From Swiss-Prot:
Gene3D superfamilies: 2.40.50.100. The lineage of its organism: Bacteria, Pseudomonadati, Pseudomonadota, Gammaproteobacteria, Alteromonadales. GO terms for cellular component: cytosol; glycine cleavage complex. The modification N6-lipoyllysine is found at K65. This is Glycine cleavage system H protein. Residues 24-106 form the Lipoyl-binding domain. Binds 1 lipoyl cofactor covalently. The gene is gcvH. CDD domains: GCS_H (cd06848). Keywords: Lipoyl. The glycine cleavage system catalyzes the degradation of glycine. The H protein shuttles the methylamine group of glycine from the P protein to the T protein. NCBIfam families: gcvH, PRK01202.1. One of its GO terms (biological process) is glycine decarboxylation via glycine cleavage system.
Length: 129
């Protein structure tokens, strides 16, 4: 069974977000998603300064099995990207909720966070797959 930290919020498309002290949110893909994809070989990230819209694809995770679009769980401006993934995409596999984060967003509408799933709700999504 996948690890689903309770302090995070989740999108049904397998992204997670974590609120940071500056009000931004860190975005990554769940352990379940990286298990399905397999070994990461390349990650394409948005650019700092890009505006992302909740539900729109904004990054790509490419593994030995497939390339998968990564969707923005919330709308806002990209304020940071995880440049370590450029040389070490395997961080997504080894530490999906830590060093394998994708990007940070300063939200334009924080109420979108309320529409995301808690750990229990995300587990239910996995169980239905």
């Amino acid at each position: 069974m996948s690890n689903i930290p309770t302090e995070l919020k989740y999108a049904s498309s397998h992204e997670w977000i974590r609120k940071e002290e500056d009000g931004s949110y860190t975005v990554g893909i769940t352990e379940h998603a990286q298990e399905l994809l397999g070994d990461m070989v390349f990650v394409e990230l948005p650019e700092v300064g890009d505006t992302v819209t909740a539900g729109d694809d904004c990054a790509v995770a490419e593994s030995v099995k497939a390339a998968s679009d990564i969707y923005a769980p919330i709308s806002g401006e990209v304020i940071a990207v995880n440049e370590a993934l450029e040389d070490s995409p395997e961080l997504v596999n080894s530490d999906a909720y830590g060093e394998g984060w994708f990007f940070r967003v300063m939200p334009s509408d924080e109420s979108e966070v309320d529409a995301l799933l808690d750990a229990e709700g995300y587990q239910a999504v996995i169980d239905e797959e």
